[in-house]
Amino acid sequence: VANGKFSEGQGDQSQVYDLQGNRIGALWSEYGRPSHFDLTIDENGDDIAVGVSKSKPDLGRVIKRRLRDGAVTVLTSGGFAGHSSTRNLDRPGWAYVTYQYSGPDWPPFWNEVVAVKLDGSQIVERIAHLHAPRTDYLTEAHAVPSPDGKRVIWASSWGAKASGRPVSAYVARLKGR
């Protein structure tokens, strides 16, 4: 998957290629649909991109986009997602998503990390509050799961709003895992 500016006046578009460098499907021309994504395989065995949609009709929602044809499935019903990770290779079928936006227009997830089921059921496991006010890129939480999906690590200044410093690493363990 190549992501970038493929046409004048546009940014954050994606094009999928096979291993021989041949295009697969059409250019994903909508801005950031998805953005801040990670790649994985879903419950049907399809290669997908999982991330936040930065365009309508699913603005702010977590979506998955099938690489072979660009089909989109909305995975969450609310919030404005940020970073997504599917590095939980031993817990397939889930994406770990950081919600760092805390405005009144984006409930129900404010400044927290969640696990989102990839099957379209809109099942979300709430994991932890981030306590991570975003002051610049280095203070973004960017939560990432362990390979078994039982723990999540993220960056946080734990509420130091003015400077966002110092930034430390925090780990949460998922209950019952």
Please annotate each region the language model reported.
Residues 1-44, 147:
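Catalytic cores of extracellular degradative/oxidative enzymes
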Residues 46-132:
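Loop/turn-rich, solvent-exposed surfaces of beta-rich toroidal or solenoidal domains
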Residues 42-43, 56, 88-89, 107, ...:
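Residue-level signal for WD-repeat beta-propeller blades
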Residues 137-177:
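Blade-level signature of beta-propeller repeat domains, shared across WD40, Kelch, NHL, RCC1
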Residues 29-45, 78-90, 137-142:
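Repeated scaffold domains used in trafficking and secretory/extracellular systems
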Residues 26, 126-129, 154:
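Residue-level detector of high-confidence beta-strand sites
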Residues 8-18, 56-65, 103-115, 160-173:
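Structural motif
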Residues 1-8, 47-52, 95-99, 151-155:
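Residue position within the beta-strands of beta-propeller blades
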